[in-house]
Amino acid sequence: MTSTTMVTTLDLVTPTSEEQPGPAPESSDFSTVVLSPDGSELVTQSAPNTPIQHREQANAEFGQKEGSPDPKNMVAATGNASKPSLNSFYADGLGQLRNGLFSCFQPVFGYFGTKTTVEIEKSEDELWEIPFDAISELEWLGSGSQGAVFRGQLENRTVAVKKVNQLKETEIKHLRHLRHQNIIEFLGVCSKSPCYCIVMEYCSKGQLCTVLKSRNTITRELFAQWVKEIADGMHYLHQNKVIHRDLKSPNILISAEDSIKICDFGTSHMQKKMDSTMMSFCGTVSWMAPEMIKKQPCNEKVDVYSFGVVLWEMLTRETPYANIAQMAIIFGVGTNILSLPMPEEAPKGLVLLIKQCLSQKGRNRPSFSHIRQHWEIFKPELFEMTEEEWQLAWDSYREFAKCIQYPSTVTRDHGGPKSAFAMEEEIQRKRHEQLNHIKDIRNMYEMKLKRTNKMYDKLQGCFTELKLKESELAEWEKDLTEREQWHNQNSPKAVAAPRAQLRGYPNEGYDDMSSDEDVQPCRGSPYRCSNTSSSSGVQSSPFSRQSSSRSSAGQQTRRSEGANPPKILRNDAIRHSGSYWETLGGARGSPARDSGFSQDSGMWSAGAGSCTAINGGGQQVCYSQTLYRNGDGRWSDGRIASRRRVSTSVNKSTAVPGQPVFFTRDSPSRVPHGVISCSSPRSSSKLNRSSYPSRNAPHQLEDGCCCAHARAPRAKSIAVPMTSSSRARSPTPYDNDFENAESFVDPESPKNLKNLEKIVNLPESTSYDEALCNSDVTMNPIYTSPITTYSNPCHVELVDEENANDVDLTSSMDSRRSRSDDADVESSEEDEGNGNNILNTSMESEDLRYRIDTSQSTMMSSLERSLEIGATRSDGLSDNEMRVQAVKMSIKTHRRTGSNPQALIHQCIDEYTTSATDDSDDAGAVRI
């Protein structure tokens, strides 16, 4: 029967022979059988595949461009028939230009009011996501393998809500663009936990299977319409490359207008290739194609097989393969031993279409485009019957399906009806799904209730805070009003007085000055650098505390406390600009900071000898005198004898036998103030470093000479032997007679040359007591008088100064050096050349000029006294390193006040602390 039907439906087409001219027969679009080239056998061709979408669109566009030809006016094709048309060529070129080049200007369209593609997609995404809260009046309709279905209201529209179990089941964005009258419309999805659901169009009449079983009568027109609409909907899906894979009567809905709506695309597949692909095992086995059951490569023809099962179901109104176990269906359909029997009285065209769709091989199944064409051919056969005959025949088809007998080995419950246990399980499953959905809805509303309560608490707190602020604002306004009223009542009315007019002043901007003490005199002004307070036309002299306006020769009292003292900064350029004291620098001990000749500073009044030079304007220029730590009354009353070394032959030639030499802190060798020049080369030994005090490096003074405008190197220390003619008392500036001043000025005087010949090396002393024992008996062991000398810095001649008081000059400058530095000196080759003179330091110079200042302090604090004891009794080798380091840091960090000045060496000192294990004073380095 099957073979006969297949032969009758095929058209036999033979190739036209040249010897037998005649009209060529029309070829069919369906499966054909043609003769082989030799004519010996027939070749069967299967039905062509479903035309893909782009080919159909191309054919439609080509037909629109060229126009449909009239069969009556067709002519034979000429030789140029294969040549493409120029119109289509240019049209295709313009289309490519429009889609290629002009597509670059699409983002610019947004500036002119045209929506871009991104904006459109964004708005679609926002509309696609529907919050579950927006759906109201949910009503349970039923449940299936993928979830329960509810009916609800969304924006005054009845919608169907299908609740799914997983989030990935809501990913159907590839289906939202589907718009067809026979395809269910998807409105959006809910992808927020806990309710994942799909919102779609609602069909009031329900599923097709339900309608078929519930309605006793269905007209033949309605039956033919439903078949055509199902084919049209599936054809639209295949055109959009969508394979349903689960087409069955429960997934076909009936709308209120009795229109077919294909739904449930949960198992749909987006076809990306023309070739057959391996698909997963999904769908219901009763409607499943054999190739899908056997997991063979398949294509869109699997939906054609399912469509054939749906046609059989519509014809018989019975469930296919009823009461057969699923595994039996899978095995029977897969091995082609189980099939759906056809009623004998059914229309032949409908039966033929069903059998073609149920073919085992997918290539033998027609496409939906061919199905639509064939249905139009078979429909007249259906309308040959009357309505009554149709109803009787339709009922008979149902009875035929009920009487189908299957082997008892494959039926459930051995062919009997469903057992009560199976029915109870199905009811429990449905009830369980309903309860799960109710539970999810309850959880969702509980979460919403919590959010609502939280928002209410926040609003309540905001209202409370707002009321509190309102009360505070009202109280503040009330207080402000009361204060304004009180102010207006009690405040006196002020009347502005006219500005006082000063007469007799050429410039009204000048202020009246009562005395010279109320003025801030600038540096170099006549108020600071002259004997009188009147201004003069001569060049102003540099200001110092020894000048005529501040010393005993000038004003005798200091400025009152109310007057602001002039600020002296550390910057040398600001502190010493425009003065003769460029050689003195801005260090502590400069004339602007440490003069001792003011009446209340603890120093003696300066005599006429302190002003030995006369400037070009006729004014006396007074020079500063440095205040040393060894001054009378200072915090270091004694002198610390430095360690001695055995003099070498170089120094022995100049030393006086039997006369020990010492360096005291008030020695002129320590702080020479004269303008000097040193040509000694810098040593290349390891002692050539910036540690204080340096023994080999000829340090450069920071102070430049104002006359020569050059930097002078610092003078080196010179050891002077003590003589028996040294005085035991502390001299005063009045001891300086004119003769001594005269000898000071004359560098070639015999007396100065005699004193210079007494320069010898300091013998090594291991302690302070030994140094005192080696000194002269007539010498004061506690105090050595400072020697006051004077020199004009403008005098560029090299002058050897004389000890005006006939006192031997000693120094303990290097007494604080450690033995580690002494060991370094012994290993130095340069020290061997200098005779291992420990005092052959950077203060040695043959062009040395002395300027020594005397000072006496009037205040000594307890802290200074304790530091003095620690400094005098320490030789740098103390075992307690922490205590020594503490003493050093105390000395370095101690601040001196104006009443307790401190003289410093005229150089810029940058002190920093190294590790605590340093015994030497190199921890406080001196950088010049």
From Swiss-Prot:
Q: Which GO terms describe its biological process?
A: axon extension involved in regeneration; axon regeneration; formation of growth cone in injured axon; MAPK cascade; microtubule polymerization; p38MAPK cascade; positive regulation of axon extension; positive regulation of axon extension involved in regeneration
Region described as Important for interaction between isoform a and isoform c: spans on this chain: 605-814
Key word Phosphoprotein present in the record? Answer: yes
The record's annotation in SMART domains points to: S_TKc (SM00220)
What ranges does the record list as Polar residues composition bias? Answer: 42-52, 647-656
What effect does gene inactivation have here?
Overcome the lack of synaptogenesis caused by the loss of rpm-1 ubiquitin ligase activity. Defects in axonal microtubule development. Double knockout with dlk-1 also suppresses the eva-1 receptor expression defect in the madd-3 single knockout. Triple knockout with madd-3 and unc-54 results in paralysis (as in the unc-54 single knockout), and suppresses the lethality phenotype in the double madd-3 and unc-54 mutant.
Q: What species was this sequence derived from?
A: Caenorhabditis elegans
Q: What class of enzyme is it?
A: transferase
- Annotated Gene Ontology cellular component terms: axon; cilium; cytoplasm; dendrite; neuronal cell body; synapse
Sequence segments annotated as region (Leucine-zipper): 459-480
Query: Which keywords does this chain's UniProt record carry?
Result: ATP-binding, Cell projection, Cytoplasm, Kinase, Magnesium, Metal-binding, Neurogenesis, Nucleotide-binding, Phosphoprotein, Serine/threonine-protein kinase, Synapse, Transferase, Ubl conjugation
Function of the protein? Component of a MAP kinase pathway that functions presynaptically to regulate synaptic architecture and presynaptic differentiation. Phosphorylates and activates mkk-4. Has a role in axonal regrowth following injury and synaptogenesis. Plays a role in modulating polymerization of neuronal microtubules. Also promotes tubulin post-translational modifications that protect microtubules. Plays a role in cilium length regulation, possibly by reducing rab-5 mediated endocytosis, and may also have a role in intraflagellar transport in cilia.
Cofactor(s) for this protein? Mg(2+)
Outcome of swapping S878A:
Prevents phosphorylation. Enhances binding to isoform c
In this chain, composition skew of type Low complexity spans 530-557, 677-695
Protein kinase domain location: 135-377
- Subunit arrangement? Homooligomer (via leucine zipper domain and hexapeptide motif). Isoform a (via leucine zipper domain) forms a heterooligomer with isoform c (via leucine zipper domain). Isoform c does not self-associate.
Give the residues the record marks as binding ATP: L141, G142, S143, G144, S145, Q146, G147, A148, V149, K162
Its name, as the record gives it, is: Mitogen-activated protein kinase kinase kinase dlk-1
List every position bearing Phosphoserine: S874, S878
Q: In which tissues is it expressed?
A: Expressed in nerve ring, nerve cord, neurons, and pharynx.
Reaction catalysed? Answer: L-seryl-[protein] + ATP = O-phospho-L-seryl-[protein] + ADP + H(+); L-threonyl-[protein] + ATP = O-phospho-L-threonyl-[protein] + ADP + H(+)
